[in-house]
């Protein structure tokens, strides 16, 4: 039996991770936050003294990355790294290492290994285009740059961190440009992906829409 896969791709701070995690919970499917793999690699490299542009060393590290997802947390070398990988600096590093072809190739099979029964919901930049091209349902989830910057700003302030809205906005614009321009797996909406703009939607509304589309796909036998 083919394991159903829902891919949710989109730009930074679009809310795709929150939506994907809730869809997975509602369906009792496995969940893969692919972006966390790149964040973990950036963090691992920083701790190991590997530069974020050292492609051969990063590819070797990616192939042997000691990572585990369990109990709602992300573990690196046996330690909970869930908070460490969310630092803004590590997010920028993840975008840089993720632009390297050898790194993406090294992490490709590791991501596919998460596809197990009863199903998988995964989010990232190239889940529907590269990692799971035959996914049951592909979503391209986005929101305006202004809305994404506002959400990220509120998130950081809520954590008690200092945050500059203008700087966050610029970082998002820069990351969008980097993601769209990279030579391997550039961020783009696939022709067979449903577009979900969450600028004016709540999280619950976005989750409900994904579930509605999934039910339609299942009913049509695709």
Swiss-Prot record:
One of its GO terms (cellular component) is cytosol. Its main location: cytoplasm. Keywords: ATP-binding, Cytoplasm, Kinase, Nucleotide-binding, Transferase. The keyword Signal does not apply. ATP binds at residues 10-18. It comes from Chromobacterium violaceum (strain ATCC 12472 / DSM 30191 / JCM 1249 / CCUG 213 / NBRC 12614 / NCIMB 9131 / NCTC 9757 / MK). It is found in: Cytoplasm. One of its GO terms (biological process) is nucleobase-containing small molecule interconversion. It catalyses: CMP + ATP = CDP + ADP; dCMP + ATP = dCDP + ADP. SUPFAM superfamilies: P-loop containing nucleoside triphosphate hydrolases (SSF52540). This is Cytidylate kinase. GO terms for molecular function: ATP binding; CMP kinase activity; dCMP kinase activity. Its EC number is 2.7.4.25. PANTHER family: CYTIDYLATE KINASE, CYTIDYLATE KINASE/PANTOATE-BETA-ALANINE LIGASE. Belongs to the cytidylate kinase family. Type 1 subfamily. It holds the Pfam family Cytidylate_kin.
